[in-house]
Amino acid sequence: MLNFQKLERSHLPRLLPYFRGQERRLSNYSAGFLFMWGRYMDTHFAEAEGCLLLRDRYVGKSYFYYPLSKDGDAAAEERALDALEEYCRSSEERLHLTAVPREKLAPLVERYGADLHVSNIRRWRDYLYDASSFRDYPGGRYSGQRNHVHKFEKTYPDHVFRTCEAEDLPAMQKFLCEYADTQYDKDDVLADEEMQGTFDILPHIAELGLYCGALYAGGKMVALSVGERCGDTMIIHIEKALRGVAGAYPAVAQAFARTFCADGVRYINREDDSGDVGLRKSKLQYLPVQLVGKYNLAVHRAIDSLSKLPSVQTARLTLRAIPDEDAPAFAVLARDEELNRWWGYNWRERTSAEHPEDKWFLEDIRFDFRHKNEIPLGIYFGETLVGEVVLHSFGYRAEAEIGMRVLPAWQRRGIAREALLGMMEYGFLKLGLERIEAKCFKENEVSARALRAALEDIYRALGELRPRRGRVLLTLDDAPPAPGFEPARQLGTFYAWRRS
């Protein structure tokens, strides 16, 4: 199980190997970006299969980056994605991928099918440039930039570009204070966050392995640039110039490229424009070779398409939503200690009331359906509620887990077997599930018999299905505490039905 922890800036030096070799050419997968924006985005991280997994939180929702290996190991990244799917399934978090590189789109569509919502928002796309173009500003297309640089050089003949070292920190901070006093919109939350991140990162330039240079004119710092090399790309995290110093921006951009963007640097990533009109115009004037998409993928599960509970008819039974008038009967089922011992759910963990009203149990399962956690259906023999069958723990590759409980007076009549078969047929044929799982403790002979019988029935009824059976060790999480019962020591039976 993945363990996401808050990404502190002190973690980043240890994580640098993940960023240094990445060839995605996206600014999001870099130490400088995460240092400056990680607090704002409430970034957390985990490691699995030799990969780094990142998670942002925005408006109460989680957004996961595509796993990043240190050496571009696609197989390891897919295994890490498996772990992420299991994490989301177990923690009931939605799998929403963000900042996905374009080259990962096709494998993800193949992995999850067509039931995806994909977006690629224009204002967050990174501007990617040919590094040689910035070094030389060649040809007629860059005549404007060359003219601005020539004007700067003519106006400030004593200009010089220097690499910044630790002893230059006071001068850099003084420059930023002058810049901040006049040149950014303090009412813009993103601009304010970016400015604070700029101040914060300067003392950590060497620690993060960043490149930093400043342009001086008349002995005064007039422009500053900070970048980070990731693979064959230099990502420009900071570029500031004082207002009134004509030509300082194209001059510092060129000087930085000539100083740091050689020896295998093919591209310069100047990040996004955040939807700022002036910034967009400026970035386009430098003629990007590509606007690098950052794709967002919301992966849908089979349950997400349901707006109301279904009704399933079998030979003797009806599986349907439980109405208000059956709240007392359902409460009897929900309160049955022996049944709940095997059910894997302790209602006492969901309420502080020692003796909740009957209606509470019904509202509890309705809550779970509204939040797309499960499909709970009452098992009806005629008009009598005799049990419950549930599809739950929905995964992101068309899988779910099934469970059922039948009142003692109605057991040993084949009801559990028939209800399981009906629910599985619905899951496979109507919901489009590819895999249904069932678990039970070996002491629970009633459920074990029903599962074995349902396995035989489903195989006969749906010949395209291939049954599979294995052995697993169930943990304390698989069942609620019960007097004298230690489920962690019980070896249970795991059944899985998968479409061929």
Where are these regions (language model features)?
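Active-site/acyl-donor-binding loops of N-acyltransferases
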Residues: 119-136, 269-306, 462-479, 493-495
